[in-house]
Regions:
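Detector for repetitive beta-architecture
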Residues: 49, 55, 61, 69-71, ...
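Polar low-complexity intrinsically disordered regions enriched in Ser/Thr and small residues
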Residues: 30, 37-39, 59, 79, ...
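Generic detector of intrinsically disordered, low-complexity, polar/charged segments
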Residues: 24, 31-33, 53, 57, ...
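Predominantly polar beta-repeat domains that present long G/T/S/D/N-rich surfaces used to bind, process
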Residues: 1-23, 107-299
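Long, low-complexity, polar/charged, intrinsically disordered or flexibly structured peripheral segments
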Residues: 1-69
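Short amphipathic alpha-helical surface micro-motifs
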Residues: 23, 32, 42, 54-62, ...
């Protein structure tokens, strides 16, 4: 797994990002062509959208809440130096990197979701190239649910022996994650810098997550507390997992738009996710068909 410990790398990516695609694969013009990274939320007092970032970077933490009529707007890779707290409706294509945690305090839903129901994969790719996609990548952990209500479940599974040490991409040993350990902010690692009172005041049950989640540490928390189960439309990539699911079903739908495709080795939508060098096929040899006998000797 690519390591997120060097946050300066992602700050540089965010600061220097410029959208170079004039149009989507479905032929529609790209309204963000030539623009840098940004994230916007609706401000009721100002009665307009306001940018949360400065040149693609949020110095500190921020709370992002979107609604159907006033979704969170994101474009490109945006880096938060501390926490990002998020819930609600999202519009656009982008990634949020955080220097600490990502706290998901309610369902996350796309305003313009993809639709993969097609007998023609290439046509489906083109149709979905302009649809919303969000990636959340935490240098710390991805914590889901109302931390004020965390007890034995899930906290017991957010510390050793359930979490394990790991080696980073440079061969350095990283100690096992311990949610109860106090970090440099003065908070336990599983809590937000905003504190439990603030998190509790804005938390809602999580029933749907339209996003790709990535963390070198832990992805966990409380999901499905409102009944009706949980649906992931994306993926979760984490070293440790401590999700407590309070209702069923648990449905996980992979979003193929983030994987490398065909000979281009590029994803359909590049939202600057952390990647390792992909495995390349250098040669292919067809040895023809052969049969293998089963355990009973029949061919």
């Amino acid at each position: 797994m690519p390591d997120l410990s060097d946050l300066s790398r992602y700050i540089e990516i965010s600061t220097n990002y410029v959208d170079r695609e004039p149009a989507f694969e479905d032929g529609t013009p790209n309204p963000n062509f030539g623009k840098g990274a940004y994230v916007e939320v609706w401000n009721d007092t100002a009665n307009k959208y306001v940018r949360v970032d400065n040149n693609g970077v949020v110095n500190g933490s921020a709370i992002l809440i979107g609604t159907t009529s006033r979704p969170i707007r994101i474009h490109g890779p945006v880096t938060f130096t501390q926490d990002c707290v998020i819930k609600g409706v999202v519009e656009g294509q982008g990634t949020i990197y955080t220097g600490r945690n990502i706290h998901i305090v309610g369902s996350i839903k796309y305003k313009n979701p993809p639709d993969f129901r097609s007998n023609n994969p290439d046509q489906a790719d083109k149709s979905n190239s302009s649809r919303d996609i969000l990636a959340l990548a935490a240098r710390g952990s991805i914590i889901m649910g109302n931390t004020a209500t965390f007890g034995y479940y899930p906290l017991n599974y957010m510390k050793p022996p359930f979490t394990k040490p790991r080696y980073d991409e440079f061969g350095n040993l990283v100690p096992a994650y311990n949610a109860l350990e106090i970090d440099e902010t003065g908070k336990p690692r599983y809590q937000s810098v905003y504190g439990d009172a603030t998190i509790s005041s804005i938390s809602e049950p999580i029933s749907q997550l339209d996003c790709v989640l990535y963390t070198n540490f832990l992805g966990g928390g409380q999901l499905g507390t409102g009944g009706g189960g949980v649906t992931f439309n994306g993926s979760i990539i984490s070293k440790d997992e401590a999700m407590v699911i309070y209702s069923l079903p648990l449905v996980m739908n992979y979003d193929p738009r983030i994987r490398e495709r065909k000979i281009s080795n590029q994803p359909l939508i590049d939202v600057s996710l952390p990647r390792t060098p992909e495995i390349m096929i250098s040669s292919w040899r067809d040895h023809g068909l052969f049969t293998r006998r089963n355990f009973h000797g029949a061919s």
